[in-house]
Amino acid sequence: MSILVKNNIHWVGQRDWEVRDFHGTEYKTLRGSSYNSYLIREEKNVLIDTVDHKFSREFVQNLRSEIDLADIDYIIINHAEEDHAGALTELMAQIPDTPIYCTANAIDSINGHHHHPEWNFKVVKTGDTLDIGNGKQLIFVETPMLHWPDSMMTYMTGDAVLFSNDAFGQHYCDERLFNDEVDQTELFEQCQRYYANILTPFSRLVTPKITEILGFNLPVDMIATSHGVVWRDNPTQIVELYLKWAADYQEDRITIFYDTMSNNTRMMADAIAQGINEVDPNVAVKIFNVARSDKNEILTNVFRSKGVLVGTSTMNNVMMPKIAGLVEEMTGLRFRNKRASAFGSHGWSGGAVDRLSTRLQDAGFEMSLSLKAKWRPDLDALELCRQHGRDIARQWALAPLPETTQKTAPAEEITTCVAADLGPKMQCSVCQWIYDPAQGEPLQDVAPGTPWSDVPDNFLCPECSLGKDVFDVLATEAK
């Protein structure tokens, strides 16, 4: 099945609803993907890219239903990766002499994958053109390391369509092809996820390359990507976002992620987040347990954040393996303009937090002081965690924060509280958190002045998330 893109340009690609892993298992494609191939029929017939190798036979069969394969005059390969050029072997078996236009680096990559040096390769460079008839040309622009050395884009004059390769794409599968037809929230979430996890290491190249392309002074009516939607409605909006994301992007956001063996490091993470929120309630704080969270969502949040707090238990004197792996990925992504702090719990010996701090610094983060706790944090240790969060909130603030002062209740209010018999304070037997009836627990809609007997049965301890049955009367108040 083909879809009309514009005039004599048709999409002849392949949707992949089921794919959930990309680049091995390193990128989770939770919304599937598509492999976009385009057929141009002017006086010359041109095929731009193919599809993933697992769809090779299906792709060639579908293409044959659109055009006699022998009538294809040129094949353009913007990128040699297997999800772009994977069907070349199947296709070239039918039309072995058809010229393949690509960069010099692409020849090496294509031969490395397909092992056919006898194919009719034509090397192109930035500014080279190919006449396709009817007064139209293809103009080639090399884009090395966006995101492979062989990458290039192809611009079609007349119709003003930029075939942008991986740039401006997203792993997003939908029955509809164009950006104005799909769910906008989903689309832009996947665009940012794609940039954060794939293109971030090359951000320093994005702005000059976009500037170079704009320097050709060519109109762009559509951007036809290699994955996801074709941008036809205000196509330059995604270009503007790329320029923004490439400029050491950050939001007023802090990401906390951790791994834990006995919930101790999780308790620290929660307390740190509480401290941040006390001082700066406007900053967005997201907490992830790496053992239970989508790794690419965590990395996307790190990309969006001004800073990250990373927590780990100590195991065999080193950090937890999932934390080590994720920090290694952050090193490769080369995030810029971000701060970091390490924290974690240990038992008879430590080592993980110091090792983690060193790794984060090596990854390019500006480091703040780390925080350690021995065994399960008690009330004093949890208060130190909250104070650490307060300190971090002030150190990482994008603008000066107002000083907070402890509000003193009016005398008559104090008298009323003392006079009222609210019952004893209750202490969680697992994490030692204390419920004070005078303060309640506003985050769970338990108002100040609520005795324990009136607290709803679905109440959960804010520190360890266990229910009311693990609470006992505070020892100092037990009679």
Curated annotation (Swiss-Prot):
Keywords: Cytoplasm, Electron transport, Flavoprotein, FMN, Iron, Metal-binding, Oxidoreductase, Transport. Pfam families: Flavodoxin_1, ODP, Rubredoxin. Gene3D superfamilies: 2.20.28.10, 3.40.50.360, Ribonuclease Z/Hydroxyacylglutathione hydrolase-like. It is found in: Cytoplasm. Anaerobic nitric oxide reductase; uses NADH to detoxify nitric oxide (NO), protecting several 4Fe-4S NO-sensitive enzymes. Has at least 2 reductase partners, only one of which (NorW, flavorubredoxin reductase) has been identified. NO probably binds to the di-iron center; electrons enter from the NorW at rubredoxin and are transferred sequentially to the FMN center and the di-iron center. Also able to function as an aerobic oxygen reductase. In the N-terminal section; belongs to the zinc metallo-hydrolase group 3 family. This is Anaerobic nitric oxide reductase flavorubredoxin. It comes from Salmonella choleraesuis (strain SC-B67).
